[in-house]
């Protein structure tokens, strides 16, 4: 297959949702359709060893939530689909934001009993920054749901994106009978209790087909016809260009648990979602059709293989083709490196990548030299931009139970900060270690990983820090004066960048007023 054909058949997407909307279940079912796993493991099984395929870290296995981002590749409809799993529990980290910089489209999953929830709103704001095309799956139709028209209105008014229903539900809860496909004028009938296999779907052609009344009953059949008259009059038609621009979302209804409707959005994804897109770098825009290799690292994951203390850097291939043993330039370090052992992933199962194309995600073994945001090329000096680092909102001082393990603690924290799990600050005036996070769960994750991966027992104490900002100044003399007078509020982060740690917002605002030449940054590009 030629290079353009290889690139054009790739689809790289992530699933975004509020916790418990069914994202992990959908991930399972998607892999089932891609023949990647034989039976879909049910999440949160009581004492069962069947963990969902994408939740692979110890703490995730205990809690039944996906904390870290995994990558899964599978074939579907003559396409090669890369699914990036993002943490869905309510305390997610910047990892999630950064993963969204590595995809070309997203599937938004909504719990139809609840509608649009807070985390979905936050994640949609992130996709807006790049106008990412969005498909929508209204999940959990096997339960009692809100009125489908209401759900569409809510998405339109809160998320400011037009909805174009592609399928429409026939009943819900115990009366859920299937969906009607608006464009194909076909009904797909649902049978319960077949969630872990791909079921033979019974199809009824034509909305006026009397067979429909026999299959679902007169009441539901008439209700469906009435609803569809309204829907076809009041809702948007699917417009491919508006979808690509991120202005309109095709909406599918179904139940992930019952494994019904998942193939409908997969068909939509492979047919409509964009092939690998161009990416903006500091000096130019890089097109996916370019033959020379380029890619950027959007996440680092420590200890994916508990037997080896390894760290893997996940890289999105932007252009060109990776081949085993090729020589690449690590632009930030200005060094040529030979990459002979890159990995491709099938959620927890990894294998050596012989080759990879634009749109694919590969893993590089990282011995501490690769950072989030690093660019690799075939020699060109360019850096991909737009991979954010956020100022944390929560802070704790971390203390050892065994003071002799200070070295392991620092090593563990620096590694965890490099992979974006938390940020670490070392105040200039003492030997404290302050951990900053975007959400509370990250603190638990760090303590449990320090223990299981670095054999360090640590506890947290409160610390008088309200917020942090990275500081820079072009006037060296004024910067020195600023540093001298504010030493008690200055710290170095994991990458040795100078940071102002403020005990209160008032303190920060005063500092900003007093030192107009110093710039205080809330986010930092990697």
UniProtKB/Swiss-Prot annotation:
GO terms for cellular component: cytosol. InterPro entries: EF-G-like_DII, EFG_III/V, G_TR_CS, P-loop_NTPase, PrfC, RF3_C, RF3_dom_3_sf, RF3_GTP-bd. It is found in: Cytoplasm. Increases the formation of ribosomal termination complexes and stimulates activities of RF-1 and RF-2. It binds guanine nucleotides and has strong preference for UGA stop codons. It may interact directly with the ribosome. The stimulation of RF-1 and RF-2 is significantly reduced by GTP and GDP, but not by GMP. One of its GO terms (biological process) is regulation of translational termination. HAMAP family: Rel_fac_3 (MF_00072). Keywords: Cytoplasm, GTP-binding, Nucleotide-binding, Protein biosynthesis. It holds the Pfam family EF-G_D2. It comes from Haemophilus ducreyi (strain 35000HP / ATCC 700724). This is Peptide chain release factor 3. Residues 8-277 form the tr-type G domain. Belongs to the TRAFAC class translation factor GTPase superfamily. Classic translation factor GTPase family. PrfC subfamily. The gene is prfC. GTP binds at residues 17-24, 85-89, 139-142. The keyword Transmembrane helix does not apply. PANTHER family: PEPTIDE CHAIN RELEASE FACTOR RF3 (PTHR43556:SF2). One of its GO terms (molecular function) is GTPase activity.
